């Protein structure tokens, strides 16, 4: 998916694909994947407090669980950078790590740079994530346990976070074709990002010979 908003001259419309060497370049490049969790114990302990009507303690447990999962993801990212070797020369303070001053990014499906939650299906398949971590995906593609993180590692020195923003019908249909998915299915998962109303007859593509009458 690529940004489609009009930008000032000289400013590119980003896609995460920009940070991976194209196949035709002949260059060897890699993208990493990860999935980690603070474990089911976070859910169980929070449930324990909820059953005792101690909502405050339940909230604290969930918040700590989320922080542990994010810290785990941060540690895994450091390990990945070390495997790529450029991380071995890092000498960052805790504040610089929090501000993500290192090289590379780790976007997650469902977030602004990669808004399609269905990418988790392929990621979990490649990692065999459920067997290795115990993390499962719900029907809405949320992760369970909730204190879990998954995503991709990009090593490109100019990789940056961005928001894809609103998407037009042409890109949605092209994207659906490349994912071997029905356009209506892609629209369902990406609905918050659509720059059109998929239910409106005025925005639906017409078949040859079809007529659209104005309702104004």
What are these regions (language model features)?
Residues 30-34, 64, 133, 150, ...:
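Structural beta-strand/beta-sheet cores of well-ordered domains, especially the beta-sheet scaffolds
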Residues 78-177, 183-184, 188-191, 202:
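Compositionally biased, low-complexity/repeat regions
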Residues 181-183, 187, 196-216:
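Acidic, low-complexity intrinsically disordered tails
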